[in-house]
Each structure stands twice: as C-alpha cells, then as structure tokens.
Amino acid sequence: MKDVQNQPDNRNIYLQRVGIRNLQYPVTVMDRNNGYQDTVATINMYVDLPVNFRGTHMSRFVEVLNRYRLGIDPKIIKNMLEELRNNLNASVARVEIEFPYFILKKAPVSSIESFLKYTCRIEGQKTEKLYEFTMSVGVPIMTLCPCSKEISERGAHNQRAMAWIHIKSKKMIWFEELIDAAEQAASSPVFTILKRVDEKFVTEHAYDNPRFVEDVAREIAVRLNRDERISWYRVEVESFESIHDHSAYACVMKDKED
C-alpha cells in the first residue's frame, strides 16, 4: 500500500512536535505501599519531524505505549522514548502522562479509612545524548489565614488549597514523599470522610497552624532543599479564598545544580 506519510515534502519546514494528544489509556504506576496501582492516564506523545517527511506514523505511538504501559517508572519512560525515536526516525521524543493517584487514608480520630485522590504527572524527553525526567503531584490541602486569626475574636477564614510540586531528581522518589511534604506544610491535610470528632480535630489543628500560601510554599521548599536526590524543583500553592472572589498564589523555583 502507498505510504503517504513517507512522501517527500518540498516546503523545507522542520516541525518540532508531531504526535498524539489527550489519549485516555490504562496504565500501571509504582505505588510505595502496594507495589503498583492501576489507573487511567491522559497521555500526550510527540516526536520531531524532519523537513523531508510529509507526516509521522501516528499508529506507532500507541504501539510503543502498549509495550511500556505496565509499571511506569523513570527507566521505563526512558526506554519508551528511545523506542519512539528509533521507530519514527526522530531525533527528539517526548511523553506527558497525567493520572489520578489514590491513597488510602485514616481519619485523624475515628480512623475510618477512605481514598483521597491526588493528581500526578510524569514528563520525559529524550534526544540521542540527553534524557530529562520530571515528576509532579497536585496535593489538596487546607490553609487558615494567620491575619484573620490575629484580628478576629472568633475563628478565622479557612479554605481548601492546592499545592503543586514539580521535581527533577537523580534517584527514585515516591509520589508519597512529595505528598507528605505538602501535607506537613499545610494548616491541615484534607480527608474524604470525616466524622464529627474528626471535623473537630481538623478545624482545631488548622487553627493552631495558620498558614499563608507563602508559608506553605516556603515550608515545602525547605523540605526539598534538604533532599539531596532532588536537582531542581518548582512549588506552586493556590488557595481558593473563602471570603474573596480571587485565589491567593505563591511560587518558588530552584535549580540546585546552579
């Protein structure tokens, strides 16, 4: 059959990225407590396209993914990208994988168990000589305003917030380690199920640990600075303010190899 993609192209324009986007696909990811966890990811896969080819072979992206979708980790991603480069005659290959990740948590007093969802993301890019791997996690947390507590006779405004941690590391790091860093930096973690005794504990704990978004970002950064495995990070914290019509935001970035 005629291979239209391999037809020559005379426009002499190099394309930095071609591929597939927003593919919903079952994958298996590493889980610190259970070994592995099955989930459904949203996946983007790209390669570059030389000036002399009209198109890439879209079906090959999913064929390669099928061979590597079980047991996603940094080494698997590296091998997947190298196979993409070879199969598609590309100099650069990139993959972005985002998925819900569930952890079983106990309520702080009643110890009732329920799953809490975190949003995890893995990005990898490979050339002939360079391999870059970034992992990210979005952690739902609670913040209580220190200023509101200071000036109010009764209570203080509090709200849910989201902490995003993005890292590059030299050695294996679990998503759970980043989640712990975010939850420990917050006024309080959040939970899917809370009974009355748990609600009392959470609200009082948050009141005793007031945090601006700036505080949360800095507390997470302190923990990441201590971890010698991490070579680069970006921390973003967004608080969905309960008494304002806007969010509060803080961000800190550091390349520890500079």
UniProtKB/Swiss-Prot annotation:
Q: Does the keyword Transmembrane helix apply?
A: no
Q: Name one GO molecular function term.
A: GTP cyclohydrolase I activity
Q: Name one GO biological process term.
A: tetrahydrofolate biosynthetic process
Against NCBIfam families, the record matches this protein to:
PRK13674.1-1
**Record carries keyword Repeat:** no
Q: Which gene encodes it?
A: folE2
Q: Which domain of life is it from?
A: Bacteria
- Family of this protein: Belongs to the GTP cyclohydrolase IV family.
Q: Its pathway? A: Cofactor biosynthesis; 7,8-dihydroneopterin triphosphate biosynthesis; 7,8-dihydroneopterin triphosphate from GTP: step 1/1
Stated EC number for the protein is 3.5.4.16
Function, in words: Converts GTP to 7,8-dihydroneopterin triphosphate.
Catalytic activity, per the record?
Answer: GTP + H2O = 7,8-dihydroneopterin 3'-triphosphate + formate + H(+)
Record-linked InterPro entries:
GTP_cyclohydrolase_FolE2 (IPR022838), GTP_cyclohydrolase_FolE2/MptA (IPR003801)
Q: Which UniProt keywords apply?
A: Hydrolase
Name of the protein in question: GTP cyclohydrolase FolE2
Site feature May be catalytically important, where: C145
